[in-house]
Amino acid sequence: MLLLFPLALTAQKSVDLDKYRFSVQYRSLPKIRIDSTYRTYNVEVEGTKLMEPLLKDMSPEKLVMLEGWRKLAEDGHISIKINLGDLLPEGVSVKERVVTTKNRDGVITGTKTYYYQEVVYTFSANASITDYKGMHIMDEELASRVNKQVYRSPEFTIRALAEGYFVVNSLTVTKQLLQNCVNRAMHHLSERISDNFGFREVTANDYMWIIDSRKHPEYAAYRQAFRVMNEVLFSMNPSSSIEGAKEQLKPAIDYFEKIKKNY
């Protein structure tokens, strides 16, 4: 609201103004309201028997972050339980890419064919959130088998090498694909829970107009009110306490309330 007052001066009376650019940092409030005393969370991950050996080196629970909350190993105010499904190949095929060379006249003088393997695969993951009393809070789908994904192998000049690539390197490729899928799922979950329940750090860039003419009768008072705003508001960060801020801003608020009646 304070930022509207300088604009009111401009709209109703010709005034020399300076554009003052600033950045402010703050924490956004949760979109979904739950018990305001809840401030800790823990994460549990369960995989299938097929995927468990590959998940051991990934520690997906460490990737889940709820901004503004404290993470515990167990017994948090809310518990996030994640179920990771299998990474399943659904189709394998060999594709080719043909490269032609031409002479100066544009006549094709040669061709070279490169072969690569494409593997269509799917992945599924879900999360369920409850509080420590056992009350259900929300479910979230993190990955769906409806979304087909495609892995493309390196290219080879010999077709047989492309045809056997996934079979020979299935463990390495599957682990890398699973890692990518898990990372995306945990990132999606972190974004969703931070939006819904977190206190996210936000940086906003904006500007306001301040009186530039020393001849203006409000110059000194306006600048003083602006200095108060600058010291209190623009110096705050997401971890700052707002205790006492309203009292410190009261002189500036009173001033702007007064001048909007005059201009």
Describe these PLM feature segments:
Residues 1-16:
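Bacterial Sec-dependent N-terminal signal peptides
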Residues 1-3, 33, 72, 117:
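Generic marker of residues within folded, mature protein domains
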Residues 12-21, 133-263:
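C-terminal/domain-edge helix-coil "capping" segments
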Residues 12-92, 251-261:
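N-terminal segment of the mature soluble domain
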Residues 28-30, 47-49, 86-88, 121-133, ...:
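Beta-strand elements of well-folded, non-transmembrane domains
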Residues 66-117, 122-127:
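A short, hydrophobic beta-strand-centered structural micro-motif
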